[in-house]
Amino acid sequence: MLPANRKKLAGLLVILLAGLTLVLWWAHAPNASLRTVLIPDTYAQRREVKWPHRGQIFDRNDSLLAYTGPRYLLVLPRRKWLDSARFNRLLNWPDSALEARVNDLRRRELPMQLNLTVSEADTLRRHCREWPALTVREYTARNYTVHVAAPVLGYAYNAAQPFLYQAQRLARGRFYRLRNGGLETYYNTLLAGHRGAYHPLLDALNQRHGSWATDTTYQPGQDLHLSLDTELQAYAERIMGERKGYIVALEPATGEILCYVSAPTYDPAALTALSRGRERSALLLSPDMPLLNRPALQANPPGSVFKLVNAAVALQLRAITANTGFRCDQSLINCVHEHPNAHNLTQALKYSCNPYFYRVLQSVVEYIPDTLAQPVDTCAVRHQNLAAWTRHVKSFGLDTLLGVDLPREKSGFVPLPAYYDRRYGRCGWQYRTIYSLSIGQGEINLTGLQTANMLAIIANRGWYYPPHFVRSVGTSGAPLPRFRQKHHTLVDSVHFAEIIPGMVAALGHGGTAELASLADVNISVAGKTGTVQNDEGDDHANFAGFAPADKPKIVVAVYIENAGFGGLSAAPCAALIMEKYLRGNIAPKRKRWENWLRCGNLAEQGH
């Protein structure tokens, strides 16, 4: 090799060794500031977004109810022939299944799309070369593992846009009444979490040098652990069948809702599934209004169940005592069945004597203390007494929002003296004008949640926690703070102890709720029947009670429209719910009731 070439080669080797030495020194430089000597002071702006995963929903036994995951749609070709028989065999579908599913789709939905299971989607992907005209589309959606508790689970508004559009177009005036987002809407902020947006300034070595914009903190979606007992919920929906009404069951010691049925029922996935538009239309246009959240939004006269509150308030105001007796004078008001005169409050509750409670409220409204000077202004006294009665009644959580964790609820209605003043004039009304309040009729209206909460107050001897569905948010192990605040009524606890014996007697021999007795399985039940008058058809059946009577673990309120006497339909229904929750199974003698109650009352079945 020539000397000149050797010199060039040696020079190149020296340069390479010097460069390698510089790189090694650079990587291990003790002072980072030394690295900036040869680098210009310029940075790259980057935006990084971290999206949270929506929280899951579990029941009280930690069974998964709702989660976000993949779904699959089969997009059918518009004008290409498809061998349906071969297609059905491929997916193990029955003969003509494809034609039936296509016919169920609304004609205006183009292209036609069918829901697929995971296994069906995998099968089509494996055979995609044999079916080039078919497309399997994957998208992320909310999945429900159960077909119950639709008004409770609800929907997120961004996922229910097709339903909301249909509701505004088809339901028109009923849209607001039928809209109910459930827990998915009420806890949307907690379930959805918050995306994190980061704005780092990066140098040539990809090292961060602060932020070029304000960062937002990432918050993952939190899980919800409900108080709902899914097994009890499914059982309650099954025995209600297609009848109209509601069932609310809660734990009185905590206010946790165990069961919440608004009948007729529907599948919670129906409102958000892309291919179920026809089903949504049927739900919106149904005259039975299955989308109406009845326990929270339908306020009705409570009927004779309200006699419990009237008795408690009269005891507190000293208008009566537990030993007060009144004759069953049907010249005042009719009594629906024959029974002996009630010589005390226990007997009056057992027989649900209308004339007795007519006299009870009359004793409250027309009570004149001996200390008042004569002559007495009876109009002023009547206003004062009714105002006191209203104040005590409202302390039971009536005529107010209980604050349940649902987007919407009604407050019900309890009339004030001013209501009757506007209607009849200040002194234009007397007790005879308002006597219907004594038996839970007339102007008073309660929701199903209020009825159940009213019985929880009696079970607790005068206090309650607001009813709620979520017993734990995220990993906190606790509900929202406001659901841990105890509320007290204006009635002393001693007076509730005077009411409960009559509620127990109502389920004994000769009582109005004898069919709801669980004495054969050693469970003592306390309750009260109600038959709500209906001028447009059959009366509505009502019952509310709790068990065991001495240490209540469950409160149940049942309201069945057009079912007649409460003791023949609503009371047996409540008994089944209590027995299912407390024992886990139903005694053989009551097992046959399950199908009977789906279509009528026990009297119609020859019980």
What are these model-predicted stretches?
Residues 1-275, 299, 322, 385-395, ...:
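Periplasmic/cell-envelope proteins involved in peptidoglycan metabolism and beta-lactam response
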